[in-house]
Each structure stands twice: as C-alpha cells, then as structure tokens.
C-alpha cells in the first residue's frame, strides 16, 4: 500500500497522479471559504453600485453636451447647456453653421475628429440621411408584376379581375370550346352528388361562383353536373422537419350526357382537397363520343402503366358490367351499355386515367371511312328511316 501511494506521488512524473490532483482540488475549494462570505457579498455589491453610478454620470454629461441647432435661440449660454468650455462650444457651433448639404462624409469626419458624438448626431439629422431612411422603409417598386401565393387566397375569389369570363362576350371569344358542350349541357338533373352550395343569389361568394369563374360555364348549367370522389387517401411526405400529412382526392365530374372529366386535389384537410379536385375536374371536362348515345364504338384496348384495360360495346339493355370505378365513370359520361375488364394492376388513380384515355382514343366510323377513302353509311339507321 505504501509503495503504490509513493509511486503515484513521484516528483519526476510527467503527469500529475490522480490522488494528488483530487487532493489539490479539495484544498483550493476549502481555501475559498476561509474569508467571511457576508463581507465578500457586501464588497461586491458596493463595487457594482459605484460602476452603475459612474455610467449614469457619463450618460448625463453626454446628453447635456448636445449643441443647440439653428432653430434654437442663440441667447443661451454655454454654461447652461453643456459642461464644455465656451470656446469649444463656439467652435463647434461655427462648424455646424458653416456646413452645407453638399459636404462629403470625409470632410465631416475631418472636422469632427475630436467630437465623434456630435458627428453622429449631425449625420442622423442630415436631410440626405432622412431621405435614405424613408426610401428604405417604403415598399420596393419594381417593374415586375408577380402574383404571390398566400394562404388567404382560399378565402378570396381567385379571379376577381376576370369577371367577364361568365358573360356572353367571353363565350364568343372561345366558340370552339363552348359549342361542343352547349347542346349537351341543356340536360338538367338535380344531382345528389354536388358538393357545392347553389344558394340564393344574395350571398357574397359561393363555390358555384368560383367554378363558373374558373371554367366559364354559367351557374345554371353547373346544376347538371355530377361529382363523384373515387379515390381518397392520406399521403405523408417525409422531410427534414418531420412527417407532413395531407389528403389526396381524385374526383370525376360529368353531366350524364357525353361530357366528363377528372381532377386531383391535395390539401391539409379533406374538404379543401375535395373542392380543389372538383374545380380541376370541371376545367378538364372533355367530350366523349358514344354510339347511339349509350355505348362505345367497338372493342377498345388500352395499357396505362401496369393497368391493362379492355372495353366492349354491347346491345341496348345490357347494362354496365364492369369494375366499380369504370361503372361510376360511365354513369358520369352517360354510357349505359358496356362490358369491361381490368388485368394487371387495379390501382384507382391509374384506372381512372386509363379509362379516360381509352374513351378519347376511340376509332370512329367517320375516321375509318376517311382513311380508306370510301363512303360511310350506317345501314341500320338508313333501313329504319325508310320504314
């Protein structure tokens, strides 16, 4: 035991032994309590009070040494305004009076070398400095006309400056787009699936007005539309701040008479995502050709990503015998007789997109006749016309 302790207390060792370092710390800690703690606290408080009083005196001297401006009366004596000698005050007042507005900053520094606080006071009250401050606080004026996105946009009609969209003048400017839908939209039906409030006209803003402003379709024709949300799911985006959750909705819109469209929406809540998808679906409505206004033309094969879709025309009274998602799209588009099947993936989002691409890629008899260079005649219709 003695050997080990003497080994740790070797004088020639490079590193202090652990026992010795611990003992040294305890001795320093005990020595700090030799004096009375009450006396030390009182002395520290006295020193702080002296320092604060000296700082206050210097501040009072600086405030009292301010030089009178041109607007102040010249009859005031230097002894009343500042503790400086009267000669220094006279020299400084002459410097202030001799300075013009066009004097550079370097000249001011050379004149006020010995009195920097007076130089700072003059710079603050200089007219050029005041103009610079006013320009910095004023809004920046640029030639760019940018519309910045704000969270308040969802509470305001987004097209306030385009009130002419729903008028007859705007419809006349785009006749090709409007004439395709004009005859089909006359079919009115009270839809139970409409999420919008078509209330009294006395209301300030409504979702129906929002849709009419976006699409250019009158509010009366929006009553014939049918809104069906087909895909609803919760989406999570992983960021460095954490997981940010949002709702995704895919909605199909149609008037049950040859016009349909789909739209996607993503927002924090389900209601906002649903309204967003409905607005985009109304904007994306397209005309869908139908044979005899009830079925498709022939057999359609479509592949969209991993979805392999097949649609077949069927006779009258056959009904809709297909996937539930295809069933709702056919109802919105006004297709009454069809059979279809889906092979491969049955993802709802890709199924809707594959269905709309298939309906728009139909080969019409008129197109086939033009390709072959032959006359096209529907024998069945011509036969029943004669009888």
UniProtKB/Swiss-Prot annotation:
Entry keyword annotation includes Phosphoprotein: yes
UniProt cross-references to Pfam families, sorted A to Z: Ribosomal_S5, Ribosomal_S5_C
Transit peptide: 1-22
Modified residues (Phosphoserine): 85
Boundaries of every S5 DRBM domain copy: 225-288
GO CC annotations on file: mitochondrial small ribosomal subunit; mitochondrion
Biased composition, class Basic and acidic residues, residue ranges: 48-60
Disordered: annotated span: 33-87
UniProt keyword list: Mitochondrion, Phosphoprotein, Ribonucleoprotein, Ribosomal protein, Transit peptide
Quaternary structure, from the entry: Component of the mitochondrial small ribosomal subunit (mt-SSU). Mature yeast 74S mitochondrial ribosomes consist of a small (37S) and a large (54S) subunit. The 37S small subunit contains a 15S ribosomal RNA (15S mt-rRNA) and at least 32 different proteins. The 54S large subunit contains a 21S rRNA (21S mt-rRNA) and at least 45 different proteins. uS3m, uS4m and uS5m form the narrow entry site of the mRNA channel.
Purpose of the protein: Component of the mitochondrial ribosome (mitoribosome), a dedicated translation machinery responsible for the synthesis of mitochondrial genome-encoded proteins, including at least some of the essential transmembrane subunits of the mitochondrial respiratory chain. The mitoribosomes are attached to the mitochondrial inner membrane and translation products are cotranslationally integrated into the membrane.
Full protein name: Small ribosomal subunit protein uS5m
Lineage summary: Eukaryota, Fungi, Dikarya, Ascomycota, Taphrinomycotina
């Amino acid at each position: 035991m003695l050997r080990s302790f003497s080994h740790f207390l070797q004088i020639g060792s490079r590193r202090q032994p652990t026992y010795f370092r611990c003992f040294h710390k305890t001795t320093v800690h005990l020595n700090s309590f030799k004096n009375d703690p009450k006396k030390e606290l009182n002395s520290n408080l006295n020193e702080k009070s002296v320092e604060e009083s000296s700082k206050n005196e210097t501040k009072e001297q600086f405030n009292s040494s301010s030089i009178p401006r041109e607007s102040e009366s010249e009859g005031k004596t230097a002894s009343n305004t500042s503790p400086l000698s009267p000669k220094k005050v006279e020299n400084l007042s002459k410097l202030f009076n001799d300075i013009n507005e066009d004097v550079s900053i370097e000249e001011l520094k050379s004149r006020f070398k010995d009195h920097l606080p007076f130089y700072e006071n003059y710079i603050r009250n200089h007219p050029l400095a005041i103009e610079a401050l006013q320009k910095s606080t004023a809004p920046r004026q640029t030639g760019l006309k940018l519309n910045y996105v704000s969270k308040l946009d969802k509470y305001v009609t987004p097209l306030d400056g385009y009130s002419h969209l729903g008028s007859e003048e705007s419809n006349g400017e785009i006749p090709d787009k409007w004439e395709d839908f004009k005859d089909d939209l006359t079919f009115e039906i009270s839809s139970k699936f409409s999420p919008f409030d078509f209330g009294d006209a006395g209301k300030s803003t409504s979702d129906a007005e929002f849709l009419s402003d976006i699409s250019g379709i009158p509010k009366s024709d929006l009553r014939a539309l049918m809104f069906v949300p087909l895909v609803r799911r919760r989406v999570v985006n992983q960021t460095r701040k954490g997981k940010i959750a949002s709702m995704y909705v895919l909605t199909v819109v149609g008037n049950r008479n040859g016009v349909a469209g789909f739209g996607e929406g993503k927002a924090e809540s389900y209601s906002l995502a649903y309204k967003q998808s409905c607005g985009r679906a109304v904007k994306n409505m397209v005309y869908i050709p139908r044979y005899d206004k009830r079925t498709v033309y022939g057999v359609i094969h479509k592949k969209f990503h991993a979805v392999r879709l097949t649609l077949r025309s069927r006779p009258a009274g056959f009904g809709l015998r297909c996937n539930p998602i295809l069933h709702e799209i056919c109802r919105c588009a006004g297709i009454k007789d069809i059979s279809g099947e889906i092979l491969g993936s049955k993802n709802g989002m890709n199924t809707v997109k594959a269905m709309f691409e298939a309906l728009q890629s139909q080969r019409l008899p008129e197109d086939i006749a033009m390709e072959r260079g032959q006359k096209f005649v529907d024998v069945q219709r011509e036969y029943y016309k004669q009888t």
